[in-house]
C-alpha cells in the first residue's frame, strides 16, 4: 500500500525502509538485502577509490539500493562487479560506475523533480528516487516498464513512477524538470527534452554518430546558449524513438 493522499516518501524514509525498519520489509526482500550488503558496500568503496565518485549522497545511494534485485537470479552473483549486465528484450542494466557518474552529474537534492529515459529494469530509477523528491521514468518496452514499476514498489519506493512510451518525447505533463537522465545513446539531443528542462537544469545523455558508441554529455540549460560538456566515452543501447534512432536501423 502506498502513502496516504499526496504524501511524498523522502530519501531519509526510503533509507529507513531499506535498513532501519527491516521488520516491516517482506522476508524475501530482507534476505536479499542482508545477503548482498557487503558486496554492495565494497562496490561503493571502489566507486570512490577507483572511479573518483565524490558525491557522498550518490555513494550512499549506491550502498543502499540492491542492484541484484534488478537482474535475473542467475546473474545476482555478478551484480556488484563493475560491468553492465543483460536484462530482458536485449537491453542492459548499466555498470555501477556509469549509474553513479550520471547521477552525480545531475547534482540532485531532495526537492529535485527528475525525468529518466530508458528505465530498463528500474535500478537507475531506484537510485534516483533515493536522492530526489520525485522521479518520472519512461521505458519504451511495456513489459520492462511494468516489471520496473513492480520492483520499486516492492522495495517500498513511492516517489517514482514508470510509464511505457516514446522517451524521446519526454513527459511534459510533469515538467519542467530539474534534471533529465537518458540511459540510451542517441544521435542528437532530443529537442523535447531541452524544452522540458528548467533553466539551470541539467540533462545527462550519451550522444554518438553511431548506435554502438557515444560520448557522455551534460547540458546545462541557460536563458540563451546552453552549456554543453563532454564527460568521456561510453556505450549504451540505442535511444529509439521519434527524436532518436529509427527502430531497426544500423546507422
Give the positions of each predicted feature.
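Class I SAM-dependent transferase core
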Residues: 2, 9-115, 123-127, 131, ...
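Conserved nucleotide-cofactor-binding alpha/beta core module
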Residues: 107-227
Amino acid at each position: 500500500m502506498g502513502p496516504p493522499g499526496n504524501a511524498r516518501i523522502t530519501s531519509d524514509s526510503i533509507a529507513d525502509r531499506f535498513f532501519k525498519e527491516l521488520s516491516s520489509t517482506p522476508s524475501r526482500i530482507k534476505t536479499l538485502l542482508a545477503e548482498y550488503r557487503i558486496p554492495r558496500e565494497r562496490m561503493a568503496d571502489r566507486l570512490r577509490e577507483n572511479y573518483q565518485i565524490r558525491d557522498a549522497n550518490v555513494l550512499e545511494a549506491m550502498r543502499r539500493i540492491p542492484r541484484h534485485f534488478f537482474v535475473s537470479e542467475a546473474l545476482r552473483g555478478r551484480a556488484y562487479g563493475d560491468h553492465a549486465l543483460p536484462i530482458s528484450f536485449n537491453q542492459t542494466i548499466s555498470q555501477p560506475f556509469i549509474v553513479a557518474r550520471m547521477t552525480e552529474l545531475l547534482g540532485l537534492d531532495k526537492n529535485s523533480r527528475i525525468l529518466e529515459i530508458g528505465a530498463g529494469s528500474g535500478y537507475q530509477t531506484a537510485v534516483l528516487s533515493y536522492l530526489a523528491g520525485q522521479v518520472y521514468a519512461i521505458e519504451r518496452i511495456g513489459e520492462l516498464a511494468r516489471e520496473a514499476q513492480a520492483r520499486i514498489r516492492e522495495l517500498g519506493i513511492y516517489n517514482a513512477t514508470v510509464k511505457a512510451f516514446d522517451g524521446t518525447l519526454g513527459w511534459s505533463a510533469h515538467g519542467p524538470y530539474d534534471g533529465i537522465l537518458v540511459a540510451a545513446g542517441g544521435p542528437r539531443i532530443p529537442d523535447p527534452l531541452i524544452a522540458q528542462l528548467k533553466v539551470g537544469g541539467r540533462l545527462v545523455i550519451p550522444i554518438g554518430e553511431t548506435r554502438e558508441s557515444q560520448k557522455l554529455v551534460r547540458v546545462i540549460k541557460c536563458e540563451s546558449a546552453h552549456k554543453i560538456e563532454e564527460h568521456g566515452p561510453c556505450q549504451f543501447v540505442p535511444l529509439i524513438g521519434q527524436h532518436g534512432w529509427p527502430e531497426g536501423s544500423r546507422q
